[in-house]
Amino acid sequence: MSIMMNLLQPLAFILPILIAVSFFTLVERKVISCMQPRKGPNITGPFGLLQPLADGLKLLFKEPVYPTNSSTTLFILTPTMALSLALSTWLPMPLPFSLVDLNLGLLFLLSMSSLMVFSILWSGWASNSKYALMGALRAVAQTISYEITLSLILLSMVLFSGGFNMRTFMTTQEQIYLIFSSWPLAMMWYISTLAETNRAPFDLAEGESELVSGFNVEYAGGPFAAFFMAEYTSILMMNTLSTILFLNPGFMYTSPTIFSISLMTTAVALSMGFLWIRATYPRFRYDQLMHLLWKNFLPITLAWCLWHISLLVTTSGIPPML
């Protein structure tokens, strides 16, 4: 019985995330169609609600195509690796209870998101296509660059809260949201999450006019669906993390139901911001993308982090501790 429970618990944790990801794709298509003078998916099921199921079945039953000169083993493993790493980033998330309650939950999350770079790089290299390789190199350079900013912002927030555990942020924000005391960091964090998840206007990795489709150009069927789900899982995870860091979803002693509803509502609102930005802004040039980080975000986040450290030292203050 205990073995069965150990198997069912991760499944019960992962399955709602995958369902949310599938319906988020439908919401994206509906929102973008509303922002343009056209209808979205409205044929499959009532109001098009069965469209994600139809898309998933179509992709799963398509025959996967493997390029002749590709590294077949690596070509097959990388989509599975990408989806597994994207799902593993949810493990320390309090939803309201985490599957794995880690004292260094933020470090674990940052490490897992950093490892996703390897799945992108290996998929581009294993495809044996110049377009896939160039898209992979672009994506890796972009992801690694913006991880520096994300890490520095997380360090500043840890100095505010006093720990790497997700629950310490709830204690810190019992009186006031951290977005009010650190709004420049919140603004840079939100823009950096757009770049980290390869979303418009920073979707340089899949520039259709230059690279056909980026690092996943040779993938079809199930492996393509795995990459697609990994990307959208990362989007929802980043927005959930943004909610926990800057917009306290519930007080420490709130009921789990209210906490979950508050967390989901705020995360969905932030995710809708991603869709709005995609429908509004054109794609940046690659040099503008890099200049934004290295010439603007990096100096500001470094200065802000040093300011937080000096503030604690000069006032002999310590952050709140559980």
Swiss-Prot record:
The biological processes this protein is annotated with in GO are: aerobic respiration
As for subcellular location, the record says: Mitochondrion inner membrane
The UniProt keywords, alphabetically, are: Electron transport, Membrane, Mitochondrion, Mitochondrion inner membrane, NAD, Respiratory chain, Translocase, Transmembrane, Transmembrane helix, Transport, Ubiquinone
Q: Does the keyword Hydrolase apply?
A: no
How does the record classify its membrane topology?
Multi-pass membrane protein
Q: Where would one find the signal peptide in this protein? A: none
E.C. numbers: 7.1.1.2
Q: Which GO terms describe its molecular function?
A: NADH dehydrogenase (ubiquinone) activity
Quote the catalytic activity from the record: a ubiquinone + NADH + 5 H(+)(in) = a ubiquinol + NAD(+) + 4 H(+)(out)
What's a Pfam family this protein contains? NADHdh
**Membrane-crossing segments per the record:** 7-27, 74-94, 104-124, 144-164, 176-196, 227-247, 257-277, 298-318
**One GO CC term of this entry?**
mitochondrial inner membrane
Q: What class of enzyme is it?
A: translocase
Reply yes or no: does the keyword Electron transport apply.
Answer: yes
Q: What functional role does this protein have?
A: Core subunit of the mitochondrial membrane respiratory chain NADH dehydrogenase (Complex I) that is believed to belong to the minimal assembly required for catalysis. Complex I functions in the transfer of electrons from NADH to the respiratory chain. The immediate electron acceptor for the enzyme is believed to be ubiquinone.
HAMAP family, per database record: NDH1_NuoH
The family assignment reads: Belongs to the complex I subunit 1 family.
**Which protein, by its recorded name, is this?**
NADH-ubiquinone oxidoreductase chain 1
Q: Which organism is it from?
A: Pelomedusa subrufa
